[in-house]
């Protein structure tokens, strides 16, 4: 406690002898009061600009995001019966699980894709690694497979140059 008291006394002595303190005491009382009010005003302005406005902007963007997400949720809920109905009505082409490897290889070649590696993962499942190819060719091929009853269980895509991707896919018969 004694150390703190001594430190406080030294600090006060230095503050009283500093140039700024001497100039402050030399000002008329009215000027000191005006400077105190100006300092308080500037402190409020800084607090408003540094804390309040950014928080207000963040709150506004969060409200907008929430509104957009609520609208998206309502749209999804509204469209869910249509999706279920369309899914139930869509005929699924059934393929023989044993013929999956040949079908994947043939359809990939037809789509202009080169199969780098094809591993059998058991009954009705294969793992495919494709050489880099345009993404625009890969997507229609996957849609074609889906239409034939082949589901993409896992997909790993690595972006290459010029819109090309290399893909690692786990495919299985639905």
Curated annotation (Swiss-Prot):
Reported phenotype of the disruption mutant: Absence of XcpZ results in decreased amount of XcpY in type II secretion system complexes.
* Keywords in alphabetical order: Cell inner membrane, Cell membrane, Membrane, Protein transport, Transmembrane, Transmembrane helix, Transport
User: For this UniProt entry, which segments traverse the membrane?
Assistant: 33-52
State the InterPro entries in the record: T2SS_GspM, T2SS_M_periplasmic_sf
Task: Specify the protein's topology with respect to the membrane.
Answer: Single-pass membrane protein
**Positions in the Cytoplasmic compartment:** 1-32
* Superkingdom assignment: Bacteria
**Residue ranges that the UniProt entry lists as topological domain Periplasmic:** 53-174
Q: Does the keyword Cell membrane apply?
A: yes
Q: One Pfam match, by short name?
A: T2SSM
GO biological process per UniProt: protein secretion by the type II secretion system
Where in the cell is the protein located?
A: Cell inner membrane
Q: What is the protein's major site of localization?
A: membrane
Q: List GO terms (cellular component aspect).
A: plasma membrane; type II protein secretion system complex
Alphabetized Gene3D superfamilies for the sequence:
General secretion pathway protein M, EpsM
Quaternary arrangement and interactors, per the entry? Type II secretion system is composed of four main components: the outer membrane complex, the inner membrane complex, the cytoplasmic secretion ATPase and the periplasm-spanning pseudopilus. Forms homodimers. Interacts with XcpY/GspL. Interacts with XcpR/GspE and XcpS/GspF.
Please give the family membership noted in the entry. Answer: Belongs to the GSP M family.
Q: What does this protein do?
A: Inner membrane component of the type II secretion system required for the energy-dependent secretion of extracellular factors such as proteases and toxins from the periplasm. Plays a role in the complex assembly and recruits XcpY resulting in a stable complex in the inner membrane. Provides thus a link between the energy-providing XcpR protein in the cytoplasm and the rest of the T2SS machinery.
Domain comment from the record reads as follows: Two distinct periplasmic domains, one located in the proximity of the transmembrane domain and the other located towards the C-terminal part of the protein are both involved in the interaction with XcpY.
Protein name, entry field: Type II secretion system protein M
The organism's lineage is: Bacteria, Pseudomonadati, Pseudomonadota, Gammaproteobacteria, Pseudomonadales
Gene symbol here is xcpZ
């Amino acid at each position: 406690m004694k150390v703190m008291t001594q430190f406080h006394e030294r600090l006060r002595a230095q503050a009283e002898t500093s140039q700024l303190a001497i100039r402050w005491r030399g000002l008329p009382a009215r000027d000191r009061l005006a400077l105190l009010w100006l300092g308080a005003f500037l402190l409020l302005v800084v607090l408003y600009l540094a804390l309040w406005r950014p928080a207000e902007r963040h709150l506004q963007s969060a409200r907008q995001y929430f509104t957009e997400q609520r609208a998206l949720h309502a749209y999804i809920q509204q469209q869910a019966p249509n999706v279920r109905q369309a899914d139930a009505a869509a005929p699924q082409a059934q393929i023989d699980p044993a013929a999956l490897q040949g079908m994947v290889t043939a359809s990939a070649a037809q789509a202009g894709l080169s199969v780098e590696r094809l591993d059998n993962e058991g009954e009705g499942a294969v793992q495919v690694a494709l050489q880099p190819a345009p993404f625009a060719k890969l997507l229609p091929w996957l849609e074609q497979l889906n239409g034939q009853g082949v589901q993409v269980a896992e997909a790993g895509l690595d972006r290459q140059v010029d819109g090309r991707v290399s893909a690692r896919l786990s495919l299985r018969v639905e």
